[in-house]
A protein has these predicted regions:
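Extended ligand-binding clefts on enzyme/binding-domain cores
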Residues: 36-88, 104-111, 146-152, 162-168, ...
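Alpha-helical support elements that line or immediately flank enzyme active sites
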Residues: 115-127, 137
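Aromatic-rich carbohydrate-recognition surfaces in CAZymes
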Residues: 107-114, 160-185
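Bacterial N-terminal signal peptides that target proteins for export
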Residues: 2-13
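Bacterial Sec-dependent N-terminal signal peptides
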Residues: 19-41
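Solenoid-like repeat scaffolds
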Residues: 388-397
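Short coil/turn linking the two alpha-helices of tandem helical-hairpin repeats
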Residues: 124-125, 181-188, 255, 317, ...
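Active-site-adjacent structural elements in enzyme catalytic domains
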Residues: 132-139, 172-179, 185, 191-209
Length: 420
């Protein structure tokens, strides 16, 4: 079994202990002051509203047969989840009933991988894989201290890898559980997906109230004023977010499930955040930007993390309804990359496209552009979808990120990324 780095539990400092004890802020208790609340019972969640149609670009644009599409997706899943552990797989079982997704290149486990892996498992009906990933994630949650309820992870900033509580993975995991509830509900003795989703959504929504304020620099997941998700739940991230962690489609589903109007407001704020962050000519998005859309120095280029924003833009259009800006954005981005050469464009650029910052032709970007092409209207969209079809998951050290992006793009382009 591959080795992996595990984030140590946060130490409980005296001040945090005293504050948490005085407020009685366990995840099953009423919170602080007049903002107190009780976790919702998963049974009270409303059903999600699925769109009536999921376009299948592989079939309807490329003319691929259903059998060929099914075989391609099965091959990708089997390679990533059950392939050769030394060169193909990123999913590994541990203990009797758990599993994790390994970032092979960095030799660590990230909540982004766990969350995307759970989404893939729900969409493909792989309940055993889903349950194993969730049990691993739940076992790794901070059990006490200011970060109680968050998941430990690792993040990159430039070439630096650091421990973090990454909102990207937290949001993916919560949404995967919500979709699992819609697909399978909960049989006696099995995981109560609705209850687990409710607990995570309450953590996301009310973490700061649970802590009776900001404790040891730990904040809530969302800024209550702008209604944007923080880059990290820390005061160090005040006024900063990432386009890749804005997920308005998810927030609209959370509104449907909980009835909380905050989530629709967060969805609108996220869409506007994309608009003000994207370059008006190329459509390229920075890694980080202030809440007002100004790129953050040192994170002001379009590189690998930014690719994930494209999937979120597409899902918002597919799941929630027509988003005219999303179509325009897709056209801008694909026109830019078509001008760079569909088979040769680089993996990183300055936002205006004038400077290459990563010359590698990245499979993960081919996948993201292929997904964008689903909602684009320019003629070149066909070439981007075809390029995505011809991708096979990478083998070797870099297979984690590209493999997950390819799997997501295949589900989106085959009409199999659905709401349950």
């Amino acid at each position: 079994m591959p080795t992996r780095r595990v984030v140590p539990r946060l130490a409980q400092v005296g001040l945090a202990l005293a504050l948490l004890t005085s407020c009685k802020t366990t995840l099953h208790s009423i919170g602080c002051g007049e903002n107190g609340y009780t976790l919702k019972d998963g049974a009270t969640l409303a059903p999600l509203r699925a769109p009536g149609f999921y376009p299948n670009a592989f079939r309807d644009v490329l003319g691929k047969s259903d059998a060929d599409i099914t075989a391609k997706i099965a091959a990708t899943f089997n390679q990533l989840f059950h392939g050769d552990p030394s060169s193909q797989a990123i999913y590994f079982t541990t203990g009797t009933d758990q599993a994790y997704i390994l970032d092979v290149l960095h030799d660590d486990v990230r909540t982004e991988g766990i969350g995307i892996g759970m989404l893939i498992a729900v969409e493909l009906g792989k309940r055993d894989e889903l349950d194993r990933l969730w049990r691993y994630a739940k076992a790794s949650q901070y059990a006490s201290g200011p970060s109680q309820g968050y998941f430990p992870s690792f993040c990159n900033k430039g070439t630096t890898v650091f421990e973090c509580d990454d909102p990207f993975g937290l949001q993916q995991i919560a949404t995967a559980l919500l979709l699992a509830r819609g697909r399978w509900m909960s049989a006696p003795g099995s995981i109560d997906y609705g209850r687990e989703a409710s607990k995570l959504l309450d953590i996301i929504r009310y973490k700061q109230e649970y802590n009776c304020g900001i404790v040891d620099d730990v904040t809530g997941t969302f800024d209550p004023s702008s209604k944007l998700v923080y880059d990290m739940p820390s005061i160090d991230s005040a006024n900063t977010s990432r386009p890749a962690i804005a997920m308005p489609a998810y927030y609209e589903l959370w509104r449907q499930a909980t009835g909380d109007a905050f989530w629709s407001e967060a969805a609108s704020a996220s869409r506007n955040y994309w608009m003000v962050s994207a370059n008006a000519t190329t459509g390229l998005l920075p890694t980080r930007a202030t809440f007002g859309g100004t790129p953050v120095p040192g994170s002001d280029t379009f590189i690998t993390e930014s690719y994930r924003a494209f999937f979120n833009i597409v899902l918002d259009h597919l799941w929630i309804g027509s988003q005219p800006w999303a179509v325009d954005e897709s056209n801008r981005v694909l026109q830019f990359f078509a001008g760079q050469g569909i088979d040769t464009y680089a993996g990183g650029y300055s936002l205006d496209g004038s400077t290459v910052v990563d010359a590698t032709h990245q499979d993960s970007l081919v996948a993201a552009n292929g997904a964008l092409a689903l909602i684009a209207t320019i003629d070149q969209r066909v070439s981007f979808i075809d390029a995505m079809w011809n991708l096979a998951p990478y083998t070797g050290k870099s297979r984690y990120y590209s493999g997950l992006m390819i799997m997501l793009a295949q589900l989106i382009l085959s009409g199999q990324m659905v709401v349950y």
